[in-house]
Amino acid sequence: MSLNDDQLQALAYLNRGCNVFITGSAGTGKTHLIRFFIHDQHTYGKQIGITATTGAAALHIGGKTLHSFMAIGLAKKSAEALAMQTMTKNKRTAKKLRALDTLVIDEVSLMDAELFDKLSAYLQIIRDDVRPFGGVQLVLCGDFAQLPPVSGSYCFTSKVWKQANIKLAKLTTPMRQQDDTVFFSLLERARWGSLTEEDMETLRSRVQATESFPDYIVPTRLYSVNADVDAINSQHLQDILDKGETMQQYEPKYEGGAEAQKERTRAWATSLGVPARLALCRGAQVVVTYNINQEDLVNGTRAVVEDLSPTSVIIKLKNGVRKVISPIVVSCDDDKSLRVTYLPLKLAWAVTIHRSQGLTLDAVQMDLGNRIFATGQAYTALSRAKTLESVSIISLSPNAFKADPLVLKFYGVSQ
C-alpha cells in the first residue's frame, strides 16, 4: 500500500501519537490512509478501535459502528449514566475501552458536537483519566464540506475539539477522479459553493445525458428526499411484477398491550425508518438497513433478492455471497416496552444522497434541482462519480451548490 506526500505527512502526525483530523475532498484517499495506519498499528500490537458513524463506512475499514463499539445504544442518556451502565452491565466492553490506545472514527463529519463531547466524558469516566477522550489517541476522518450532521452543530464546534489539540491533515491529491482532473477541479469549486458559469454550462451538458452508459448498466439514482426515492423504487418493482414475478409483503409487528401503547411503538419505529409495509420480489435491488453483523451485513450493504418466503429473504451480496435475512427485534434504548419486529431491508434502485456518502459509482444519476435542501448535499452526490461522463443529471439548479459559512471558516476558505 503506497502513500502520496499528503498522506505521508498525515501519517507522521499519527505516528507521533497526535490527535489528527484527516480531511480533504471526496476521493482523495482518506479511507486508504486509515486502512494503512490500522495495518501499521496492528503490527506493533496496538489496541485500536476501528469505528465509523455509519454502517457502510464501518464496512469499508473493517470496523464497527461507533455506537456498537462503544456499547452506547442510541446515546440518549448522559455520559455518566452510559459509563455506569457499561461498567456494571458490560464489563467486557469497559475492559476493552480501558486498554484502548487509539480510536479511529471515520465519517466523523456526520457526528454532532453534543455526541462528541459526550463520548469524551464517557471515556474519561471509564478510563478514570481527565484528558480528552480519556487519553486515547483520536484518528478522525471526514469532510465537513459534505453532508452535515442530521441534527445539532458540527463536532468541530464542541468544547472537546478545542481541548484535544487536533491536528488538521489535508489530503489534496485526487484518487477517485485521477483520470479526469478537469472534473476534479470543478468538484473543488462545488465543494466551496463557488461554481463558475463555465462550470454550470459543463454540468448542463450532462442533464439527461445517458450516452456513455452501456445497455447493461443501470445508473444508481441519487435523490435528496425519500419521497423521490420511494417513487423510483416502486416503479422498478412494478416492472418486475409485470413480468410475472410474485410479490411478498412484510409488515412490522408492533408490541404492546393497549392500542395507545402500540401507537407509541409505531411512531417510534417510524422515526427509526421502519416502513409500515415492505414489498419485495425476486430480482429486487435492496439495501440492508440495520447492522445485523459486523462483517458483511451492515446498514448500507447492497444486494439483490434471490428468493423469498413469508418469513425470510435470501439475498445475494455484491461479492456473490448469499445470506438469509430474517426479521429482527429492536427495542428502545430508553423504554424497553417499545419493541418492533421487522425485516431490515429496503428497495434500492434509488438511494438518498445521505446513504450514498462514501461510495464510488461508475454510473450514477442524480437530481441536483430545487429539492436539494442541505449544504454539501449536491457536492456529495456529484463527487460519487469517477468522471463527468459517468454522470447523468436529472435536473439542475444553480442554488443547489452551497457551503456552510461555519465550514468555510473552519477550513480557512474565503469567498
Enumerate the predicted regions with their spans.
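Conserved ATP-binding/catalytic motifs of P-loop helicase motor domains
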Residues: M1-Q415
